[in-house]
């Protein structure tokens, strides 16, 4: 990892240079805003040493719930490994703390939209195999992730060697499950407030139980079924308050049998969810068993892990836009006719995370997706439009009454 901690000196800390350009550290130029959230904003940046674009996460120093420094510490703990974004710098930037990171490509949620909200068995199996290894690595560093959702898994930038690698980003909700002082597993507790994304979080999380490694795996299983079905049975539930909605989501998860959730799909998906839900709080998961479940799905399909995902031909068929940046750069970053940089929603998701909602029970963070509960369920947004303070895009309307037909 090439990250460095910025000092408080005038020479190394972020300043406005003689040309009036805002800088982070000695060589990172701060550009336009491409994303925002409750705890700060995301800026496009540029490394003036090599002209590569970066993502710069900014958090006010006076934030009431600072998390950027903790996220930076977790990235240092994780180090350099496949599927983790490279961190270049952490330090002050005026009234902000700044985290400078590798700019990645599209999120799985963006790619899901690109594929008309349907992934094939082959694609989901390959995604599952990568993400199980990714979560396994995080767990080996004594961290639990606690923020599984499609927006937090990104491919590398287009036309680079990382374009088929799924990266795990946004460790603002991660937690050490091994006590640093004692070297022992954290204690089992109940009556915890919700932390994570309601759509994907485990049943035990809804029940207020302390999270451990098992909960990351169960949340992955819910996300895999989301990709296969197109939606989950607990999406689009209405309630007067967020607390009541989370309660309804949890109740529906408990009432939906695994066999019903996974009906029409290979039994390995049901086996995986049953396994994750039966794990003990302290238990080390058998990651190889989980990985091989999805490898067997590929084997029965007569397929190999060839990195040919459903989105691959769709991205390959995207023509290079007029006036775009150098062809080796991501198609996320483009130039308008005026020469201004324009970044897609995928790039804005990268390394940033989503809007957070504080649960009134205890003040821990409940992670919501960018739009509503996890996301507005397909087909129940009457306007068909997704909005936030930075983006507006049109979405096709879909029916979510039945799972997508697997071909």
UniProtKB/Swiss-Prot annotation:
Catalysed reactions, as listed in the record: L-seryl-[protein] + ATP = O-phospho-L-seryl-[protein] + ADP + H(+); L-threonyl-[protein] + ATP = O-phospho-L-threonyl-[protein] + ADP + H(+)
Binding site for ATP: 34-42, 57
Compositional bias (Basic and acidic residues): 328-339
Assigned keywords, A-Z: ATP-binding, Cell cycle, Cell division, Cytoplasm, Kinase, Meiosis, Nucleotide-binding, Serine/threonine-protein kinase, Transferase
Domain of life (superkingdom): Eukaryota
GO biological process, one term: asymmetric cell division
Residue numbers spanned by region Disordered: 319-339, 359-384
Subcellular location: Cytoplasm, Cell cortex; Cytoplasm
Active site: 147 (proton acceptor)
EC number: 2.7.11.1
Disruption phenotype: RNAi-mediated knockdown in 1-cell embryos results in mislocalization of the pronuclei and the spindle towards the anterior part of the embryo, spindle instability, and failure of asymmetric cell division in 50 percent of embryos. In addition, spindle pulling forces are increased. par-2 and par-3 mediated embryo polarity is normal. Oocytes have increased cortical grp-1 and grp-2 localization. Large polar bodies formation during female meiosis.
Residues in Protein kinase domain copies: 28-298
Major subcellular location class: cytoplasm
Molecular function (Gene Ontology), one example: protein serine/threonine kinase activity
Tissue: Broadly expressed; expression observed in pharynx, head neurons, hypodermis, intestine, ventral cord, dorsal cord, vulval muscles and body-wall muscles.
Coiled-coil residue spans: none
Gene Ontology CC terms, in alphabetical order: aster; cell cortex; cytoplasm; nucleus; plasma membrane
InterPro entries: CK1_Ser-Thr_kinase, Kinase-like_dom_sf, Prot_kinase_dom, Protein_kinase_ATP_BS, Ser/Thr_kinase_AS
Keyword Nucleotide-binding in annotation: yes
Any further remark recorded for this protein: Shares partial functional conservation with human CSNK1G1, CSNK1G2 and CSNK1G3 in reverting increased survival in excess iodide.
PANTHER family: CASEIN KINASE-RELATED
Role, per record: Involved in the asymmetric cell division of the embryo downstream of par-2 and par-3 by regulating the asymmetric cortical distribution of pkk-1, a phosphatidylinositol 4,5-bisphosphate-producing enzyme, which in turn regulates the asymmetrical distribution of grp-1, grp-2 and lin-5. Prevents expulsion of the entire meiotic spindle into a polar body by negatively regulating the Rho GTPase signaling pathway. Involved in regulation of reactive oxygen species (ROS) levels.
UniProt similarity note: Belongs to the protein kinase superfamily. CK1 Ser/Thr protein kinase family. Casein kinase I subfamily.
Subunit structure: Interacts with doxa-1.
Name this polypeptide is given: Casein kinase I gamma
Organism: Caenorhabditis elegans
Annotated gene: csnk-1
């Amino acid at each position: 990892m090439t990250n460095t901690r910025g000092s408080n000196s005038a020479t190394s800390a972020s300043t406005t240079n003689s040309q009036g350009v805002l800088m982070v550290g000695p060589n990172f130029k701060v550009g336009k805003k491409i994303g925002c959230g409750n705890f700060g904003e995301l800026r496009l940046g540029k490394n003036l040493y090599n002209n590569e674009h970066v993502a710069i996460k900014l958090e006010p120093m006076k934030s009431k719930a600072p998390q950027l420094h903790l996220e930076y510490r977790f990235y240092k703990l994780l180090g350099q490994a496949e599927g983790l974004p490279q961190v270049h710098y952490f330090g002050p930037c005026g009234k902000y703390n700044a985290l400078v990171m590798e700019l990645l490509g599209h999120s799985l949620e963006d790619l899901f939209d690109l594929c008309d909200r349907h992934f094939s068995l082959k694609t989901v199996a390959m995604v599952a195999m990568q993400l199980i290894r990714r979560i396994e690595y995080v767990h080996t560093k004594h961290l639990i992730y606690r923020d599984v959702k499609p927006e937090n898994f990104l491919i590398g930038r287009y036309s680079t060697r990382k374009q088929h690698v799924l990266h795990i980003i946004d460790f603002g909700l991660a937690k050490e499950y091994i006590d640093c002082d004692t070297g022992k597993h954290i204690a089992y507790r109940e009556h915890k407030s919700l932390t994570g994304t309601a759509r994907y979080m485990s049943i035990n999380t809804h029940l207020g139980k302390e999270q451990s490694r098992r909960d990351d795996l169960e949340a992955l299983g819910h996300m895999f079924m989301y990709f296969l079905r197109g939606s989950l049975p607990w999406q689009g539930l209405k309630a007067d308050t967020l607390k009541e909605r989370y309660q309804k989501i949890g109740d529906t998860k408990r009432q939906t049998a695994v066999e019903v959730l996974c009906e029409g799909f290979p039994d390995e998906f049901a086996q995986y969810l049953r396994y994750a839900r039966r794990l003990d709080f302290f238990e080390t998961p058998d990651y190889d068993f989980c990985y091989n479940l999805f490898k067997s799905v590929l084997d029965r399909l007569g397929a190999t892990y060839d990195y040919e995902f459903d989105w691959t031909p769709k991205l390959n068929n995207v023509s290079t836009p007029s006036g775009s940046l150098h062809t080796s750069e991501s198609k996320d970053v483009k130039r308008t006719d005026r020469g201004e940089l324009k970044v897609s929603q995928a790039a804005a998701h990268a390394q940033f995370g989503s809007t957070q909602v504080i649960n009134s029970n205890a003040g821990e963070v409940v992670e919501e997706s960018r739009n509503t509960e996890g996301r507005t369920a397909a087909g129940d947004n009457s306007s068909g439009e997704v909005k936030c303070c930075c983006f507006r895009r049109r979405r096709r309307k879909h029916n979510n009454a039945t799972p997508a037909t697997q071909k």
